[in-house]
From Swiss-Prot:
Record-given protein name: Transcription antitermination protein NusB
GO cellular component, one term: cytosol
Coiled-coil annotated spans: none
InterPro entries, sorted: NusB-like_sf (IPR035926), NusB_fam (IPR011605), NusB_RsmB_TIM44 (IPR006027)
Assigned keywords, A-Z: RNA-binding, Transcription, Transcription antitermination, Transcription regulation
BP GO annotations: DNA-templated transcription termination; transcription antitermination
Role description: Involved in transcription antitermination. Required for transcription of ribosomal RNA (rRNA) genes. Binds specifically to the boxA antiterminator sequence of the ribosomal RNA (rrn) operons.
Species annotation: Finegoldia magna (strain ATCC 29328 / DSM 20472 / WAL 2508)
Family according to the record: Belongs to the NusB family.
Entries under SUPFAM superfamilies matching the protein: NusB-like
Signal peptide (residue range): none
HAMAP family: NusB (MF_00073)
Molecular function per GO: RNA binding
Length: 137
């Protein structure tokens, strides 16, 4: 599994968690068995999802603070999951350069979401990065 595939799998599991309201770490192992994810390629996937679960409140607050005039309930659930993966990588996954995290989130949006979503996601993650660089998160 490539890092891109790991992100895709993380997005899928986070989407499921958001839809079910179940953020239990046990879901990771169940998802891996169901998806038949290779043990050698699972570390990056787990790093994203575990950081998401650990920091979910902060990630949600950061997204809310960077979506001007948007209530999170108005954001497509898939787009929200992509944003959560992107914010998680920018803030908590040190092995991923910030620009790569943003680009990969945009690519996920282009592949799996609506035509307008990728620019929306790019804008929000760009704002998150600017605040991080200015240390105002």
């Amino acid at each position: 599994m490539s890092r891109r595939q790991s992100r895709k799998s993380a997005m899928q599991l986070i989407y499921e968690m958001n839809m079910n309201g179940d953020y239990d770490k046990q879901r990771i192992e169940e998802f891996c068995k169901y998806q038949n994810i290779n043990k050698n390629d699972i570390e990056f996937f787990k790093e994203i999802v575990l950081n998401f679960i650990e920091h979910i409140d902060d990630i949600v607050n950061i997204i809310e603070n960077n979506t001007k005039q948007w209530n999170l309930d108005r954001i497509n659930k898939l787009d929200l999951s992509i944003l959560q993966v992107g914010v998680c990588e920018i803030l908590y996954v040190e092995s991923t350069p910030d620009s790569v995290a943003i680009n990969e989130a945009v690519e996920l949006a282009k592949e799996y979401s609506t035509e307008k979503s990728y620019s929306f996601i790019n804008g929000i993650l760009g704002s998150v990065l600017k605040r991080k660089e200015n240390a105002s998160l």
